Amino acid sequence: MDKIVKNYLYNLSYQILILIVPLITTPYVSRTLGAKGIGTFSYTNSIVQYFILFGCIGLNLYGQREIAYVQHEQEKRNIVFWELVILRIITVSISLFIYFFTLAAHGTYASIFLIMSLDILASMVDISWFFQGIEDFKKIVIRNFIIKIIGVLLIFIFVKSADDLCLYVICHSATLFLGNLSMWAYIPKLVGRVRLRGLSVKKHVRPTIVLFLPQIATSVYTVLDKTMIGFLTGIEEEVAYYEQGQKIVKIAMTLVISLGTVMMPRVANLFKQHQTEQVKSYLVKSFRFVFFLAFPMMFGLMAICSNFVPWFFGNGYNRVVPNIIVIAPILVLIALSNIMGTQYLLPIGRQKEYTLSVVTGCIVNFLMNLILIPKFYSIGAAIATVIAEASVTGVQIFCTRKDFCFWKIANNNKQYVISSLVMFIIIYTLSPKLQSSIINTFLCIIIGGGIYLGTLLIIKDDTIIEAIEKIKTRIGK
């Protein structure tokens, strides 16, 4: 359990690092490039993500799981690693070839698409799945921390006006590529040489495609929404409003879903050893963790966004506020589906049920986007995303009904929902009355956190009581 906690903290640090960089740069970039520049970047980047998606064909999740299966068997681990690396080079190369002959050479944003080819190359050399599979998250954090800091400095040095969009894209894509490439420095000590003739790349194709299908579906409500806003409205600013709203929600989401990345290899390894009860014990704790964090984060974001958005993004981003309020529920929905899907169904090999859930979400999201975006623009996309995530979570609850009694779990954790609602009512009333400033936003966060924890203490929640007892014990020592 100690290793899981350490890996969670390392992975949490890594995920926060990935998202904290745009959080640091966003106030500056949103003012420098403007809503149109941000919208152009988001729109072109959403298209590039399709080529990365098809190039990787599910290899990230599959690679993480397969390495987890053989993490303690060095020879098998060597073979699996090199087989998957070769397969990845082949598939991403095909995707890159198609990319150059379609968008990069002939697209409307040719120069931006050309620079963003580095993103596709970055996906080719990405081996983070290997370190996640062997449950070693420390190396990922340290190496990428340095690269990300360099990226932030480059943005502040070179991006000075709305005409510097290409320079911004270079800073983004180059640091992504160098960050992934740098992880190879550890490989000589962790992976041995193998004979090429002894490798069988072909055997991995079918299982990766099985995992690839749900990823295609997932991309519809993680990437296609931005593409559809741009295509259906033709207003680049609307893409920016949606992108910025999602960005804030995703930063909060990182705290919760990081546990899924850590738990997946552990559950896969335990399942292989037939320790089913241990698996379920871990997941019940995951549910409690999600209820404890996700609900106050969701209601907290909805309560403070009217005070936060004006000073953080600057003028011209008022529509980000309703975007955040509407899309905030995905914090809870994705956190729950992360447990049932990423932490349970995938590691134990129940891909069909996982695929069913995300395909359902894909269809729902696409149809809702077609109906809502033309009428409500970015807000319509936000509504569609929430409905889609609700359908994914609903299907997964149904598929795991014999393994977990979700309603019993929800009832056992209802105190977190009640405490979050109490906090929301007070902060939602207070926030608009205060002048928009960094001090007042943090004041709302501190007051909200105090109300949430105080309410849990009043109703004598076990988690809070245990935490207080541990603190008392340590102080006593």
Each predicted region: which residue ranges?
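Helix-loop junctions and terminal segments of transmembrane helices
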Residues: 27, 55-72, 249-287, 291-294, ...
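Interhelical loop/hinge segments that connect adjacent transmembrane helices in multipass membrane
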Residues: 4, 138, 165-172, 181-222, ...
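Membrane-proximal transmembrane or re-entrant/amphipathic helices at the cytosolic face
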Residues: 234, 428-477
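N-terminal membrane topogenesis motif
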Residues: 1-23, 75, 198-214, 320, ...
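Hydrophobic alpha-helical transmembrane segments
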Residues: 117, 142-189, 207, 214, ...
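Membrane-interface junctions at transmembrane-helix termini in multi-pass inner-membrane proteins
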Residues: 120-144, 329-360
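Interfacial segments at transmembrane-helix termini and the short loops linking adjacent helices
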Residues: 102-119, 236, 301-333
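Signature of the first transmembrane helix
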Residues: 3-60, 96, 152, 172, ...
